[in-house]
A protein has these predicted regions:
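Helix-start/capping segments and mature chain N-termini
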Residues: 1-163
Length: 163
């Protein structure tokens, strides 16, 4: 499966700032059923541009999540993912499962907003989904992303996709 080897991602604007839902939780930014059509359209557009998947970005320059996946980054201080709440990000069961297991293995985990350049300089980046698994991101907008095969295996193990 191509996602197992890695994916090329295209950044697409979600059209809102990273804190757009902080003062307006009634807008239901993190409700999956309301965003399904947009997610399908984003994937279709990304694929029409030669990418395998999309990563939504905020208008203030932060990477948020994939249309059907959570974003995880490995850096010197552990694993990062995008915070939920003000960002309108859906809570990812797969990311939560991985972060719990990583913490039990002594790996630091945190939520934080991440700029495009930080992700390109990270040790690795992945899109995680309970259906599609753990997909290493090979490139974002045509820029290569460093690969960490050991961490890919660990993420897949923590998520329950490998032993």
């Amino acid at each position: 499966i191509e996602e197992r080897e890695g994916i090329d991602a295209l950044c697409l604007s979600r059209g809102v700032t990273s804190d757009a839902f902080a003062d307006a939780p009634w807008l239901l930014g993190g409700v999956k059923t309301l965003s399904y059509a947009v997610n399908v359209a984003a994937l279709r557009y990304a694929r029409s541009q030669g990418a395998d998947d999309a990563i939504f970005t905020s208008t203030d320059g932060y990477l948020l999540e994939g249309p059907t996946s959570g974003l995880v980054i490995a850096a010197d201080d552990g694993l990062w993912t995008t915070p939920t709440g003000p960002t309108g990000i859906l809570n990812s069961i797969t990311v939560s499962t991985v972060f719990e297991a990583a913490g039990e293995d002594g790996v630091q985990t945190s939520t934080r907003l991440m700029k495009h350049g930080e992700v390109l300089r990270a040790q690795g980046a992945w899109l995680l989904s309970s259906v599609r698994g753990v997909a290493p991101i090979l490139s974002i907008d045509g820029h290569p992303v460093p690969q960490d095969e050991d961490m890919t295996h660990r993420l897949r193990t923590w998520a329950g996709f490998e032993n």
